[in-house]
């Protein structure tokens, strides 16, 4: 009896060990994360502050803030010290929240179509989607993702109607750092977070 149980468990472990671990594709990953966001936005029982907090958590799951920041700064990333980078990451995230938070919360049940994956380079893919507005207009909304060391697909750029979030901010940061210092850039971001004009 005991011998049979041991053999059975051994076979089970062998089968489990031989089974391939399922990894979600980039499109599946984006669809799952976007649907989580939509679930929050459609929840009429949640107040705005509660929605913002839940969206903040989902943002951390969906995006890689350091990779996004690196791409937005481009070569200028190397101009920042480790301490400046550690301050830049949360500051920039707060700037993004202030800039796009209200727009996301204004979502009014538009339909989202998940179309295809387009390879960019090794380990990087663009997931192409379309937002169908209430006026029957199609808005291209693409997510650029990369596969991190743990094998998870994370967003590092969003392209809406051919306008890249990364390139938009890189242009702004290049202009600031061409004449100023990393500390001056951080001060500009601090003021943006506080809602002050720069």
Regions found by a protein language model. Name each.
Residues 1-9:
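Bacterial N-terminal signal peptides that target proteins for export
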Residues 8-17:
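Bacterial N-terminal signal peptides
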Residues 17-23:
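Sec/Tat signal peptide C-region and signal peptidase I cleavage site
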Residues 25-100:
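Early exported N-terminus immediately downstream of N-terminal targeting peptides
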Residues 92, 116-119, 130-133, 145-147, ...:
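A mature extracytoplasmic/lumenal domain signature
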Residues 98-139, 187, 192-198:
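Surface-exposed, charged secondary-structure patches
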Residues 140-167:
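Short beta-strand edge/turn micro-motifs at domain boundaries
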Residues 157-198:
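Low-complexity, intrinsically disordered terminal/linker segments enriched in charged
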């Amino acid at each position: 009896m005991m011998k049979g149980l041991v053999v059975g468990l051994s076979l089970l472990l062998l089968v489990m060990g031989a089974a391939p671990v399922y990894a979600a594709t980039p499109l599946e990953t984006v669809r799952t994360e976007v649907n989580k966001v939509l679930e929050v936005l459609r929840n009429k029982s949640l107040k705005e502050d509660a929605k913002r907090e839940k969206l903040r958590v989902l943002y951390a799951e969906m995006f890689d803030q350091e990779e996004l920041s690196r791409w937005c700064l481009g070569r200028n990333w190397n101009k920042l010290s480790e301490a400046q980078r550690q301050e830049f990451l949360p500051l920039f995230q707060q700037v993004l929240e202030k800039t796009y938070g209200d727009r996301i919360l204004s979502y009014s049940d538009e339909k989202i179509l998940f179309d295809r994956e387009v390879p960019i380079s090794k380990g990087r893919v663009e997931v192409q989607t379309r937002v169908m507005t209430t006026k029957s207009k199609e808005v291209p909304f693409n997510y650029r993702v990369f596969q991190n060391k743990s094998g998870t697909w994370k967003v590092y750029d969003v392209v809406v109607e051919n306008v890249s979030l990364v390139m938009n901010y890189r242009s702004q940061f290049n202009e600031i750092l061409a004449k100023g210092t990393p500390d001056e850039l951080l001060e500009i971001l601090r003021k943006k977070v506080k809602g002050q004009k720069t």
